[in-house]
Amino acid sequence: METIRGRKSLELDFYGLAKRLSGYDHIMMDLGTGDGRYVHYLAENNPGWFVIGMDLCRENLHEHSRAKLQNMLFIIASAQELPRELNGLISHVTINFPWGSLLEGLLTGDTKLIRGLAYLSRSAPSVDVRLNGGALAEAGWALETGTEQIYNNMIGAGWHVNTPVMLNAHALRTFPSTWAKRIAFGCDPRAMELSGWLSSLP
């Protein structure tokens, strides 16, 4: 499994990962983490959590992956090819403002993505998915109908999902990610949040 710290790429096997995670009960993963600012914020403000950021684009991660936090790890991997080393370890998953192939996978109910999330997770894991209007528009969906499509795909895959919640510009401005702030000050400062938990494997 490839990890990154600054500009250095490092291989981490199952045993090395187990050593890093030892002593942490709450292990969360941010999928499609972008520049890693959200992961850095959570790890710095929640020392009892272990926070993992995952993205395929290593260049964006150079800055935040440099931080010397023992409870933070960045992994280079695709959402459709999640590392098996993580199976059964994750208690909470976040997907913040996805676009491109990650958003497309959520919209189509991609089997590799949905099953991968389920296998990563411990019993009764929770998930937060935040969607923005601009990315959905680029994919050919309105915010409301795109959110409904993803909601239905998650329900069909065995997730219990609460009623979607609208995030306004103020909520986006105060959310600790670079992309949220860009959305807040952009031409379409709207987003939706889906929160739920897994009840069964798909």
Language model features: what each stretch is:
Residues 1-27, 37-44:
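S-adenosyl-L-methionine
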Residues 32-36:
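Class I SAM-dependent methyltransferase "Motif I" SAM/SAH-binding loop
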Residues 57:
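Conserved SAM/SAH-binding beta-strand->alpha-helix loop
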Residues 70-79:
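Conserved SAM-binding strand-loop segment of SAM-dependent methyltransferases
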Residues 80-92:
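A short acidic, Gly/Pro-enriched loop at the edge of an enzyme's catalytic core
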Residues 108-123:
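A short glycine-rich, Lys/Arg-flanked "PGG" loop and its adjoining helix->strand segment in the class I
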Residues 124-132:
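Conserved beta-strand signature within the Rossmann-like core of class I S-adenosyl-L-methionine
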Residues 138-202:
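Class I S-adenosyl-L-methionine
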